[in-house]
């Protein structure tokens, strides 16, 4: 029984599904998808639970969320192993994900009060108040790269605001989704407040098509995000928050410490086996001898990266990709770039057939025309050389995406120019592209999102503002507008 609907674990009535470890092939999870009727059932449960949950005081909702945080802490080792085994990422990285889940709760509580709490301004004849109210029933679509942390970034602020939720994890990480749901169950979340439906495309389409849905919060690919945007077009009454991918540029302009710059680049391009939406996909490198030396060192260090299993000792920097198919897609993308005229610098290698263990790839595309403006979700870095910084910024902005952008340079003036001209929601200076602060908004523009950033700003799309003018008594104004006569004279 792998669906959680209205406080009960039930068996899915849709297609059967098996999840295996992408490296070892070990069976980790088996179950059935939710069919359309069960998705409807989950929506009815969420709708029925909404009035009571929304009417609880914030302190009461907060208490449930804090119990969930305590359970994350006490079950950290177990949840770390589940995420690592299911995604293929090393244990050390899965542990950082669970830590991020715990930290996100305190940040979400603070953001609730700062961004969507209550404010009151006294006026001579009363007060002006600002309150926030929950939307109602929200669908949350989770991604596979951070199956705990990223859905958590939607679910926690949505619950704090008083919404009820239907959560669909990625079909590639059903075990992680179920494990997190069981912790919410232990935390004492009332029936119907959070419902879990497993499944792939058909389940997702049934969920997004629900008429009685008040909104949808999505993290995933641009292609799916565009489909959801089209599906919900003409429905302005529904809140839609899309957090999508990127074709992110990293500009290497001047390098004082080559190894430090190489380390930053590897952290930007290859951490999580390149499966972060903020990963550097395009390396823009200044022409010249210094750039040549940097590139040679980058290739030399990158070719030492050997992906391994989640529990290997010593721990590898990267593990496998989410699936063998995902790894093959990266290899295919590399082959297409090479066929277009790209200059191979480091060829990606699938270490073992039937696994997702893929080494990084680096290819130079300077002067090659028609390179697709697409996100390759894996450890593949394309390199372009440039002559002037103005040219580098033009190249950085030459994409339909706009998630992250970075600059390596000792010159503050160049960063200031980039801040003015970059088309990206995250712009970093001498920091990895994959670094982001939860106390700041997380999101992009263009094909990277619909201007609904998450993290610190997630509270914004989880509640709507209600403005009020208030007075505890009613008196006739001492001064009336022209044309108003409240005298006792009788009009004849």
Swiss-Prot record:
Biological process (GO), any one: arginine catabolic process to succinate
Positions annotated as active site in the UniProt record: 243, 277
Keyword hit for Acetylation: no
Source organism of this protein record: Escherichia coli (strain K12)
PROSITE patterns according to UniProt: ALDEHYDE_DEHYDR_CYS, ALDEHYDE_DEHYDR_GLU
Enzyme Commission identifier(s): 1.2.1.71
Pathway: Amino-acid degradation; L-arginine degradation via AST pathway; L-glutamate and succinate from L-arginine: step 4/5
Function: Catalyzes the NAD-dependent reduction of succinylglutamate semialdehyde into succinylglutamate. Also shows in vitro activity with decanal or succinic semialdehyde as the electron donor and NAD as the electron acceptor. No activity is detected with NADP as the electron acceptor. Therefore, is an aldehyde dehydrogenase with broad substrate specificity.
Keyword hit for Repressor: no
PANTHER family: ALDEHYDE DEHYDROGENASE-RELATED (PTHR11699)
Family: Belongs to the aldehyde dehydrogenase family. AstD subfamily.
Inducing factors: By nitrogen starvation, and arginine. Induced at stationary phase by sigma S.
GO molecular function annotations of the record: aldehyde dehydrogenase (NAD+) activity; succinate-semialdehyde dehydrogenase (NAD+) activity; succinylglutamate-semialdehyde dehydrogenase activity
Residues annotated to bind NAD(+): 220-225
Name of the encoding gene: astD
Key words of the record: Arginine metabolism, NAD, Oxidoreductase, Stress response
Name of the protein in its database record: N-succinylglutamate 5-semialdehyde dehydrogenase
InterPro entries: Ald_DH/histidinol_DH (IPR016161), Ald_DH_C (IPR016163), Ald_DH_CS_CYS (IPR016160), Ald_DH_CS_GLU (IPR029510), Ald_DH_N (IPR016162), Aldehyde_DH_dom (IPR015590), SuccinylGlu_semiald_DH_AstD (IPR017649)
Lineage of producing organism: Bacteria, Pseudomonadati, Pseudomonadota, Gammaproteobacteria, Enterobacterales
Database matches in NCBIfam families: arg_catab_astD, PRK09457.1
């Amino acid at each position: 029984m792998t669906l959680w609907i209205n406080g009960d674990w039930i068996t899915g009535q849709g297609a059967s599904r098996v999840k295996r470890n992408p490296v070892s092939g070990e069976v980790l999870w088996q179950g059935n998808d939710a069919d359309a009727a069960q998705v409807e059932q989950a929506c009815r449960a969420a709708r029925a639970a909404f009035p009571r949950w929304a009417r609880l005081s914030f302190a009461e909702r907060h208490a449930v969320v804090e119990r969930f945080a305590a359970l994350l802490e006490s079950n950290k080792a177990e949840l770390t192993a589940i995420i690592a085994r299911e995604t293929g990422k090393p244990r050390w990285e899965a542990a950082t994900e669970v830590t991020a889940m715990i930290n996100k709760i305190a940040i979400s509580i603070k953001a609730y009060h700062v961004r969507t709490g209550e404010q009151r301004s006294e006026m001579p004849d009363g007060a002006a108040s600002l309150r926030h109210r929950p939307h109602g029933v929200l669908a949350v679509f989770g991604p596979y790269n951070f199956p705990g942390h990223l859905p958590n970034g939607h679910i926690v602020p949505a619950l704090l605001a008083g919404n009820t939720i239907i959560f669909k994890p990625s079909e590639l990480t059903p075990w992680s989704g179920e494990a997190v749901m069981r912790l919410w169950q232990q935390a004492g979340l009332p029936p119907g407040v959070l419902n879990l439906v497993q499944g792939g495309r058909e389940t997702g389409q049934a969920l997004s098509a629900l008429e009685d849905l008040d909104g949808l919060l999505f993290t995933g690919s641009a292609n799916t995000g565009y489909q959801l945007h089209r599906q919900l077009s003409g429905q302005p009454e529904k809140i839609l928050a899309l957090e999508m991918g990127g074709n992110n540029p990293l500009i290497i302009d001047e390098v004082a410490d080559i190894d430090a710059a190489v380390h930053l680049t590897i952290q930007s391009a290859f951490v999580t086996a390149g499966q972060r939406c903020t990963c550097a996909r395009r390396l823009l490198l200044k022409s010249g001898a210094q750039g040549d030396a940097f590139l040679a060192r980058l290739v030399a260090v990158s070719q030492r990266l050997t992906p391994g299993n989640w529990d290997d000792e010593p721990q590898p920097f990267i593990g496998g990709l989410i699936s063998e198919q995902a790894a093959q897609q990266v290899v295919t993308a590399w082959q297409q770039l090479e066929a277009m005229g790209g200059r191979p610098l480091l060829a990606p290698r699938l270490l073992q057939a039937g696994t997702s263990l893929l080494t990084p790839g680096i290819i130079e595309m300077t002067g090659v025309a028609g390179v697709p403006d697409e996100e390759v979700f894996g450890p593949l870095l394309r390199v372009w050389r440039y002559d002037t910084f103005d040219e580098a910024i033009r190249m950085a902005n030459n994409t339909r995406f706009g998630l992250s952008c970075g600059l390596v340079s000792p010159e503050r003036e160049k960063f200031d120019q980039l801040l003015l001209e970059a088309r990206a929601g995250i712009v970093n200076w001498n920091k990895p592209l994959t670094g982001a602060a939860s106390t700041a908004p997380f999101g992009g523009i263009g094909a990277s999102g619909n201007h609904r950033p998450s993290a610190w700003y997630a509270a914004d799309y989880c509640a709507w503002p209600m403005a009020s003018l208030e007075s505890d008594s009613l008196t006739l104004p001492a001064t009336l507008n022209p044309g108003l006569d409240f005298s006792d004279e009788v009009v004849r």
